[in-house]
Amino acid sequence: YVSLGKDCPSGISWSVSGTGEYYSIGNYRKWAFYPQASLTYMKTPEHILQLSLSTQKTYPGYWEMQSSVSYINGYSEIWGTPGLRPQTNYSVNANYVVKQKYVFGAYFSRTQDQFMQTAYQSTERLAMIYKMMNWNYTQYVGLMATVPFRIGTWWDSRWVAVEQYARHRCDDFFDLPFDRKKWILQCQWDNTFKLNKNLTFELRGFMQTPAIQGTYDLKMVGTVDAGVKWTFAGDKATLSARCSDIFNTSMPECNLRYGGQDLSLIHISEPTRHLRI
């Protein structure tokens, strides 16, 4: 491990570090170097430019690497994957901060050897196979913006938007290799309303357009959260209530309609709506 950094009088500060590693499991052996770097330029607090490079390695779990088959029911099976390799994420981010509140950014993220469990309908027998596998990579390129605003003293709001281009590729997925691409938009709107000096109301909304996860298609999803806080007894006591996912819509509908596969995953569980007081 090595690390260097410096703060310059010109308003530039930077740091660079790196970690070397040798990993061995079974027949898989690999030397790897994981760099980290950051650069900040702040001539004045009104205009700040931030650049960063990061890497992160994630190892598969023990049970995921066992040579075993477990049965959910008479149709669905979970396969272990001996020799499952660790995944490595590389991310590059650039942010421009204006007046210490408006943020505009761009990013690139690539996860090499991404391991993920995906369903596959066997072409040899009547069986649904769930298996954790190493994909070639997942990759995202995107733009983001954070814009806060205020109306008087009673309404604070913040709008966040992320537009990204996703690509998922696996050349060794049973007999069904895939290389899928999708534009995805995410929007979040946070609002705080100060009704009077003792009563505050919060409202949050989130939305994501249809997305992909390997061979899966994820439909549009959205959530609405709300909360209220009352301060009384001379600001010595507070009563608050919050309801998350009011319309119970945070879990996306997931379908598989790729390469002759036909599957609809129906989410059956406790409601995602929660009320806390």
Predicted feature residues:
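Repeated loop/turn-to-beta-strand initiation elements of outer-membrane beta-barrel proteins
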Residues: 10-14, 46-49, 100-104, 153-157, ...
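Surface-exposed extracellular loop regions of Gram-negative outer-membrane beta-barrel proteins
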Residues: 1-40, 45-90, 106-129, 156-165, 186-210, 246-261
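Transmembrane beta-strands of outer-membrane beta-barrel pores
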Residues: 18-26, 53-59, 69, 100, ...
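Membrane-embedded beta-strand positions of outer-membrane beta-barrel proteins
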Residues: 16-18, 51-53, 104-106, 145, ...
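Outer membrane beta-barrel strand-and-loop segments of large Gram-negative receptors
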Residues: 1, 85, 104-161, 169-188
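Single conserved hydrophobic/aromatic residue that forms the stacking wall/gate
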Residues: 266-277
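C-terminal beta-barrel architecture of Gram-negative outer-membrane proteins
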Residues: 163, 168, 185-231, 244-247, ...
